[in-house]
Amino acid sequence: MNYQKKKGNLIHKTAVINWRNLKIGINNKIGPYVVIGGEAQHPRKKSDGKIYIGDNNVFNEYCNVHLPTSRKKKTFIGNSNYIMNSTTIDHDCYIEDNVILSSNVVLGGNVYIMKGAQLGIRTIVHQNQVIGSYSMIGMGTLITKKKMIEPGYIFYGKPVKKIKSNNIALKRKKISEQKLKNELI
């Protein structure tokens, strides 16, 4: 099967992992050619610090997770996230729990993704963005500087536009829009 058990995780033999700079939970699946702990892709800052990965995450083939840019920062991936193939999580990103990143998603540095968000195929998120909880981003969307992705809404396009409330996800999770608005305060 080409997978091996290591530190309570299932890791493909072709995965490249910087164990020295990684703190990882259990029951994660790390697929073929995944790179965790590559240098931060920043022209003026040195890679330093740690990557923190919780429990029960799936990293499909060719994903990249980069080191943070200083010891005071971290690249963080919570619990039960599903990261599809060829996704890039750049330096200093913070991903909460139950997030889905579809194939070929690219997160610039310092992106914060709140719980339950779903990003469609080939979504590109510019650095320093916040993606609200239980938001859904349509495939091929480009999120540039200074755009607030509000919790609980569906967004799509180039440039990105708010389409409507993500009612289905909110009903499934029994979450009111008012509760999500309070997250922004």
Cite the ranges covered by each PLM segment:
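Glycine-rich hexapeptide-repeat left-handed beta-helix
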Residues: M1, K5-K7, K29-I53, V58-N64, ...
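Conserved CoA-thioester-binding segment of acyl-CoA-metabolizing enzymes
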Residues: H12-T14, G25, G31
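Long alpha-helical scaffolds
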Residues: T14-A15, V160
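Short metal-binding segments enriched for Cys and/or His
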Residues: D90
